[in-house]
Amino acid sequence: MKTFTYNNKDITIPKPFDSCFFGSNPLKEMTIHNRFNDEYYQQSATLPAFAVAIYDTIIGSEMSEDYDTMQKGLTWFQKYFTKQYFVLLD
């Protein structure tokens, strides 16, 4: 398992997400837009790159119908990035 310190919190990355590519700067903040935005309703959330990698894995798992991995990712997001979870994944 990998651990990152972000906003003075230690965040553990569980398997299988610990094998994600987190980029050269995993703590770099990125803005992700809700994938269901339209011209009347738009939401976005700021996340560190390591959380964006897990977000991408969740979306990919949903598309490939790997619901076990998807649920593990959703549970992780609910624990560590609750506000962003409700904006992006709920």
Show the residue positions of the predicted features.
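Acidic, low-complexity, intrinsically disordered interaction modules
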Residues: 25-79
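Short, charged/polar N-terminal "headpieces" of proteins
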Residues: 1-29
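Short, isolated positions in well-ordered beta-strands
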Residues: 11-13, 41, 84
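A broad, low-amplitude sensor of folded, mature protein cores
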Residues: 3-8, 66, 72, 90
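Acidic, proline/glycine-rich low-complexity IDRs
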Residues: 81-89
